[in-house]
């Protein structure tokens, strides 16, 4: 029987505001000993630079600095690498999370447009019946956004909009980020202590 800690998760980070969400998710999965297959879109790298101040000229060096100290394994796949392992349904994973998910990527997934590794990996989740979680970060929403989200929801995709709660008394930005990451982990029944639950 495969031990839980050896399982693979795919994490996508797009150019939507909130790259810190995807980074925290990756950190948390790696800290729990999981294997993470990471895909960052071109616009996602720009958000790394603009929002977080990271130097992105040496991408693999940056990722090693961010994630190299965790017990889990990180495998980085360039978004153009359509032949990567995660592009095939025969490669087994527990599911995929795109966090944050831009409306452009959400639309591509909704319409089966798999012209890069991010959207192809999401398409694989759908065709293989594996969990796919999207964390859209956009406001306000217009009708096309809502129609695409409804279409994906009807296909079994879990949508967890980046809408942190306040009932648990967050006092820092980290608290808000951890809440959203915790909600994603909840969708995979992964135990965590990232936020205080209602009634605790």
Residues covered by each model-derived region:
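A cross-family phosphate/adenosyl-ligand binding-site feature
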Residues: 2-133, 139-200
